[in-house]
Amino acid sequence: MSGVSTAAYFARRAAQKERVRILYRRALKDTLNWAVHRHIFYRDASDLREKFNVNQDVEDVDRIDKLIAHGEAEYNKWRHPDPYIVPWAPGGSKFCRNPTPPAGIEIVYNYGLEDNP
């Protein structure tokens, strides 16, 4: 194996590891969207981890690419149609909601240091 092909192999493996990590994290977060209670989520998360652990010892890079593509397709097929978004996060109901203060309210910047005549 030459130096260039070795570097290309390691770069491809690093990219695959990153794709698997991202896929697992997205699938785990989506599992939380489907679970109503935590005890259901824990069971589903354990099942998801087992699915990933089955193929962790595969060394063939082409087979790994096929497994990742299959996993991404399965994730897209089973994504939750209405995922939970926390209110203050982008896409949440309260994101960037800063109401203007009512008229007549003034801000005192030197609180406690006012001049008392």
Curated annotation (Swiss-Prot):
The membrane topology noted for this protein in its Swiss-Prot or TrEMBL record is:
Peripheral membrane protein
* N-acetylserine PTM positions: S2
**Source domain of life:** Eukaryota
Question: What keywords appear on the UniProt entry?
Answer: Acetylation, Electron transport, Membrane, Mitochondrion, Mitochondrion inner membrane, Respiratory chain, Transport
Family according to the record: Belongs to the complex I LYR family.
Tissues expressing the protein? Expressed in roots, stems, flowers, rosette leaves, cauline leaves and siliques, with the highest expression in the stems.
This one is known as: NADH dehydrogenase [ubiquinone] 1 beta subcomplex subunit 9
Q: What happens when the gene is disrupted?
A: Shorter roots, smaller plants and delayed flowering.
Q: How does it assemble?
A: Complex I is composed of at least 49 different subunits.
One GO cellular component this record assigns the protein to is:
mitochondrial membrane
Please cite one Gene Ontology biological process associated with this protein. Answer: photorespiration
| Compartment(s) of residence | Mitochondrion inner membrane
Q: What does this protein do?
A: Accessory subunit of the mitochondrial membrane respiratory chain NADH dehydrogenase (Complex I), that is believed to be not involved in catalysis. Complex I functions in the transfer of electrons from NADH to the respiratory chain. The immediate electron acceptor for the enzyme is believed to be ubiquinone. Is required for correct plant growth and development.
The encoding gene is CIB22
Q: Which organism is it from?
A: Arabidopsis thaliana
Primary site of residence: mitochondrion
